[in-house]
Amino acid sequence: MATNFLAHEKIWFDKFKYDDAERRFYEQMNGPVAGASRQENGASVILRDIARARENIQKSLAGSSGPGASSGTSGDHGELVVRIASLEVENQSLRGVVQELQQAISKLEARLNVLEKSSPGHRATAPQTQHVSPMRQVEPPAKKPATPAEDDEDDDIDLFGSDNEEEDKEAAQLREERLRQYAEKKAKKPALVAKSSILLDVKPWDDETDMAQLEACVRSIQLDGLVWGASKLVPVGYGIRKLQIQCVVEDDKVGTDLLEEEITKFEEHVQSVDIAAFNKI
């Protein structure tokens, strides 16, 4: 029963042989020998095409004389003729490029020859040697005898520096004078006065307080170094408004405590005084 089943079953028992053959084939194709042969074939492809074209031309010439020439061979010959024509055109263009290169090389050689011929004529001539006469001994000039007038001038030289002492005294006096003038000039300049800008909140007792009268009372305060500025009424609540007034004071003359004391003297109108803002100018 088992043998009958194996007889009817399609099993490929020789598959390993085909696998080995395929592996050897690809190894030969990818090996170094195959690569070298492909390089040689690629290098000589043009020569083989030319040789094949010549053979086909000779065969076509021999076959065209006979009556049994077929139409298929004539088509192949036409393709070969076109291929040969393109190769001839490429060959002519390469020849033209080679000729141009040869002409350029010949021009360069001629230029080099001209430069080599002209270089010896431009060599710098060696400078002529100058004859130097032997050294002669030079005698020093004879000293003239000193005259009495020159002796008197030498006697006038102050060896102890008395003139320098007088010049030092004059320079010290000049320096002191300049310092005194600078001090006087600096004293005449007005000294910088430190000032501050103060924003006051003056609050009344109730909504029945006359705010115009309150502002008049505040502005009636006149102090040295105090300048009143702008003012406005700011609502507080329940119909009550406070007086917000700005002033500029000199820090050395007017202080915030003094301002508060002077404003709170108006007890009938003023309840309290607060400093809302304080900035140095």
Swiss-Prot record:
SMART domains with a match to the protein in the record: EF-1_beta_acid, EF1_GNE
Show the InterPro entries listed in the entry.
eEF-1beta-like_sf, EF-1_beta_acid_region_euk, EF1B_bsu/dsu, EF1B_bsu/dsu_GNE, Transl_elong_EF1B/ribsomal_bS6, Transl_elong_EF1B_B/D_CS
| Region described as Disordered: spans on this chain | 118-172
Any one of the GO CC terms: fibrillar center
Q: Which residues carry this modification: N-acetylalanine?
A: A2
Keywords recorded for this protein, A-Z:
Acetylation, DNA-binding, Elongation factor, Nucleus, Phosphoprotein, Protein biosynthesis, Transcription, Transcription regulation
The UniProt induction remark is: By homocysteine (HC), may mediate accelerated synthesis of free thiol-containing proteins in response to HC-induced oxidative stress. Also induced following exposure to ionizing radiation.
Name a biological process GO annotation: cellular response to heat
Task: Give the modified residues of type N6-acetyllysine.
Answer: K17, K107, K117
> In the record, which positions carry Phosphothreonine?
T73, T129, T147
Tissue expression: Isoform 2 is specifically expressed in brain, cerebellum and testis.
What is the protein's quaternary organization?
A: EF-1 is composed of 4 subunits: alpha, beta, delta isoform 1, and gamma. Isoform 2 interacts with HSF1 and NFE2L2.
Q: State the protein's name.
A: Elongation factor 1-delta
Instruction: Write down the species.
Output: Homo sapiens (Human)
Q: Gene name on record? A: EEF1D
